[in-house]
């Protein structure tokens, strides 16, 4: 049984994330180790459910998993050789490093999301045409942008923490 079947979803890049979450919670309840007669087996199943959910939750890992189902997921850890992409990626990273406001981070998030949306469209075409080399390259780029999104989340959290914190020395 593949991850999509586990959550009763179509084998596709575009899935209903609300259904994924709902089915995940239902399966977690069903296979919770504290409620099972065979706790070891339930623990294994629960771990599989968690891993499948994590894989399908993000578009980059979902795309990589689709390639794995077609046995086309080899060399996904290779570096990206597209010079123009690498140049744009470096500029994005620099912008993130220099971001000092939540507004700047929001703008950056929108830009990254636009890149991701374009790459999702590319992946769908590559996948449907079975252009596996291009599909793998697109997954590498999706992974990069997913990491940037994660870093934007961290930067936003850090900004919020900085705004909420106060200097104890000022009070004494």
Curated annotation (Swiss-Prot):
Any Gene Ontology biological process: protein complex oligomerization
PROSITE patterns documented for this protein: DNAJ_2
Signal peptide interval: none
J domain mapped to chain residues: 2-69
Keywords per UniProt: Chaperone
Gene3D superfamilies to which the protein is assigned, alphabetical: DnaJ domain, HscB, C-terminal domain
Coiled coil feature spans: none
InterPro entries: DnaJ_domain (IPR001623), HscB (IPR004640), HscB_C_sf (IPR036386), HscB_oligo_C (IPR009073), J_dom_sf (IPR036869)
A Pfam family it matches: DnaJ
Entry's Gene Ontology molecular function annotations: ATPase activator activity; protein-folding chaperone binding
Subunit structure: Interacts with HscA and stimulates its ATPase activity.
Family: Belongs to the HscB family.
Function: Co-chaperone involved in the maturation of iron-sulfur cluster-containing proteins. Seems to help targeting proteins to be folded toward HscA.
Protein name per UniProt: Co-chaperone protein HscB homolog
Organism this protein belongs to: Acinetobacter baumannii (strain ATCC 17978 / DSM 105126 / CIP 53.77 / LMG 1025 / NCDC KC755 / 5377)
């Amino acid at each position: 049984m593949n991850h999509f079947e586990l959550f009763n979803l179509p084998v596709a890049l575009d899935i209903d994330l609300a259904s994924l979450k709902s089915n995940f919670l239902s399966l977690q309840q069903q296979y919770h180790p504290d409620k099972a007669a065979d706790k070891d087996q339930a623990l294994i199943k629960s771990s599989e459910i968690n891993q499948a959910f994590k894989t399908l939750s993000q578009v980059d890992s979902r795309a990589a998993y689709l390639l794995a189902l077609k046995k086309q997921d080899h060399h996904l850890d290779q570096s990206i050789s597209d010079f123009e992409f690498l140049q744009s990626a470096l500029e994005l990273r620099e912008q993130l490093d220099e971001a000092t406001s939540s507004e700047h981070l929001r703008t950056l998030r929108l830009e990254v999301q636009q890149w991701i949306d374009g790459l999702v469209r590319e992946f769908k075409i590559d996948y449907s045409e079975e252009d596996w080399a291009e599909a793998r390259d697109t997954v590498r780029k999706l992974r990069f942008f997913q990491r940037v999104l994660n870093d934007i989340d961290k930067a936003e959290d850090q900004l919020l923490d900085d705004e909420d914190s106060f200097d104890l020395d000022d009070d004494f």
